[in-house]
């Protein structure tokens, strides 16, 4: 397996697909990286030369991926919580942040149902 940005990418897959195993790199970003590195997207990872791998590594290093990206996202959320913005308060309470309704659903964000004891109609 080839290591790019600290991640072992699969050898048997095409390079454009293998790059998506890196956090922060999707299909379109992978295609851009390969275009900048001048590598064919249809090449298998096992068939890449050391020179091509080096060019891909240099190009990926220019992007914010893996730990740096995760750290930046966490810091952004913490900043929102510290300034007590609406979004920060929603993050703190564990509720949906982007304006979704919460009367009936939002179970993913709210967690399992907390039943109220002795509630009679």
Swiss-Prot record:
GO terms for molecular function: rRNA binding; structural constituent of ribosome; tRNA binding. One of its GO terms (biological process) is translation. Keywords: Ribonucleoprotein, Ribosomal protein, RNA-binding, rRNA-binding, tRNA-binding. It holds the Pfam family Ribosomal_S13. One of its GO terms (cellular component) is small ribosomal subunit. Residues 91-121 are annotated as: Disordered. InterPro entries: Rbsml_uS13_C, Ribosomal_uS13, Ribosomal_uS13-like_H2TH, Ribosomal_uS13_bac-type, Ribosomal_uS13_CS. Part of the 30S ribosomal subunit. Forms a loose heterodimer with protein S19. Forms two bridges to the 50S subunit in the 70S ribosome. Located at the top of the head of the 30S subunit, it contacts several helices of the 16S rRNA. In the 70S ribosome it contacts the 23S rRNA (bridge B1a) and protein L5 of the 50S subunit (bridge B1b), connecting the 2 subunits; these bridges are implicated in subunit movement. Contacts the tRNAs in the A and P-sites. NCBIfam families: uS13_bact. Belongs to the universal ribosomal protein uS13 family. This is Small ribosomal subunit protein uS13. It comes from Staphylococcus carnosus (strain TM300).
């Amino acid at each position: 397996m080839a290591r790019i940005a600290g991640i072992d990418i699969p050898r048997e897959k095409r390079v454009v697909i293998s790059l998506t195993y890196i956090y922060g790199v999707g299909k379109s970003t992978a295609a851009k990286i390969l275009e900048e590195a001048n590598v064919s997207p249809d090449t298998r990872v096992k068939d890449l030369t050391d020179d091509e791998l080096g060019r891909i590594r240099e190009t990926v290093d220019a992007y914010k991926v893996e730990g740096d990206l995760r750290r930046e996202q966490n810091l952004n959320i913490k900043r929102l919580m510290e300034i007590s913005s609406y979004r920060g308060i929603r993050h703190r309470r564990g509720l949906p942040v982007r304006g979704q309704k919460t009367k009936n659903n939002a179970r993913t964000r709210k967690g399992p149902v907390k039943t109220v004891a002795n509630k009679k109609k």
